[in-house]
Amino acid sequence: MKTANLKSATIAALLGLGVLTGCTNSTTNQKTSDNMETLNLTQEWDKKFPQSDKVNHRKVTFRNRYGIMLAADLYEPKSAEGKLAAIAVSGPFGAVKEQTSGLYAQTMAERGFLTLAFDPSYTGESGGEPRNTASPDINTEDFNAAVDFLTAQPHVDAERIGIIGICGFGGMGLNAAAMDTRIKATVASTMYDMSRVNANGYFDAENSADARKQKREAMNTVRTRDAQNGTTTPGTPGLPAEIKGDEPQFVKDYFDYYKTDRGFHARSVNSNGAWSPTMALSFINMPLLSYIHEIDNAVLLIHGENAHSRYFSEDAFKRLKGDNKELLIVPGANHTDLYDRMIPFNKLEKFFKSNLK
């Protein structure tokens, strides 16, 4: 195993640990069966990055094994010939495919891969009720379902499929790679371990049975009240409406991405909504990274030098086994720099071309 360095600068965290969506204009209804919900998919280019003239793009849908229909953007290089290596992309936690994951996907398509950026279950344009919730099991399955979809595409070589998980979906991606042997290469970029941060708090500051009990009691009180009253308690937004100046730096960095024109999107939970107040319950009791030491295929962890979340990747890297595992630290970068400003695409291209061949 090896640790590499790169160059870059600015920002720091995630808002999706039980703390931290939408609208469309022109839409198309898509339905896969009479038993499935209809998705209203916008057909306009409403993404936070310009459309590439080197890539063909189209909206697609597919179901996971829980019957939830997922919405995705498929990117294919216009110069494509024959069957291609493919990459499924998702995250950050609380973001939509029109934000970071779409930027990763389109750029990797420009570099020769067929790519798929999808909205996780219960968020964005994907289906699932109630809205704005998450699950370590179902969101891991979302990655596995994306692999299902890619294996069935005529221009994809089913033996050359990788994934990119960003932020909270970095941990989900590692969990998917630990169970899905079809995934030949995995990147976790600016990763959060959502189980650990929900159970233990930031930097494990709440890592005690008493602290976890208090969290469980608070969330189960909400469940009881909702059951008795037939209501659904709304969540509290993870980001403030405005920055006052005394917030932790990582909150300022999140705000700079999700709440400004740089990254704001109306369908993003982190930009324009709030997570279910009971969302963290399952994460507390279901450790995502339990079996990552059994991943045989290649893994690349990428994190910013100045990211508050860097310890998630460093600790995960210590548990990975084999010479095909790598940790890349991007100098000067914080957590959200890897959302858009300092993504090491040359390294990503080299990694996937080396391991999807």
Question: Language-model segments: which ranges?
Answer:
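Alpha/beta-hydrolase-fold enzymes
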Residues: 175-257
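Short beta-strand/loop motif that positions the catalytic acidic residue
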Residues: 295, 301-303
